[in-house]
Every structure is written in C-alpha cells, then in structure tokens.
Amino acid sequence: MVAPVPLHPDVVALAPLLGVWVGEGTGEYPTVPSFAYTEEITFGHVGKPFLSYVQRTRAADDGRPLHSETGYVRSPAPHCVEWILAHPTGITEILEGILERIVTGEGDTLRIDVESTAVGRSASAKEVSAVGRTIELAGDTLTYSVRMAAVGMPLQHHLSAVLHRA
C-alpha cells in the first residue's frame, strides 16, 4: 500500500484547486459560431512544487470531443502563479500573474488572474498571439473566463464556465 504524498509547501496556496471539477461552459469568437460544452478538469499533485492540470471538453448537444489541454500550475513566490499549458492543436501557453485570496463574510475566494508571457505554436497550428485566464474558486464552485487574441483578432472574451467539485 502506498502512503499519500504530502503536499509541497510551495503549492499550499493552490491546494483548494485539488480534485475533479465538472460543469458546463459557453464559447464564442468572431471566427466561429457560439457553442456550449461540458467539461471536466482535474488538478493533482505528486509532492513536487507544482499541481498537474488536465482538462477535457465535449459538445453539450451531442457529446463529441471538443478541446483538451494539459499542464502544470506553480506558485514560485507568494501571490504569484505560473501556468504552463500544452494543447493537442500545436499550441503552448506560458501564463503568469497573480494569486490572491479574497476574504468576505461569506467565505474565502481564491482568484487567479494570468496573462500569456509566451505563446508557442507548431507550423500547422492556428495563429494565437495572446491568452488571458481568470479563475475564481469559492467553496465547491470554480468559475473561469478565457480571453484570446487569434487569427488577427484582438484579445477578447472566448470562454466561460461554471464547474463544481465532483
């Protein structure tokens, strides 16, 4: 029997993200028709100074696979977060920003706000020049929005979703 691995001290502030999240979202962009999707996100850890991240979406209407991405989330310094992502479409993202805990009378909210510092792409990938992500976690509800600049369009809203701890 394998004992659970203790959480690395550098990711304690990110610990509320750990687990499986399921929910629904919507997407839009000037170059594609609006769409709805279901989603599952898993944040895990192996005792190192990062969390693992795996995301999968399916079309809400017929369940066909849509998008997936995988990567790592790190907090190299207090209130700082780095998110490194790879997409099977040939895109990679390095995002950096802030990690804050907002305390209210109704409980704590964990907020992550990151912007891309680098976007890489393979020769066959569509052009994506910038990405921003905002994640808020309050209790067992995780909400996010994604902004994207792609195919000559400026940075603008692309995705939003509400997920609940499974």
Swiss-Prot record:
Q: Which Pfam families match?
A: THAP4_heme-bd
Q: Name one GO molecular function term.
A: peroxynitrite isomerase activity
Motif GXWXGXG at which residues? 19-25
Give the cofactor binding note. Binds 1 heme b group per subunit, that coordinates a highly solvent-exposed Fe(III) atom.
Task: Spell out the reaction equation it catalyses.
Answer: peroxynitrite = nitrate
SUPFAM superfamilies referenced in this protein's UniProt entry, alphabetically: Lipocalins
**By what name is this protein known?**
Peroxynitrite isomerase 1
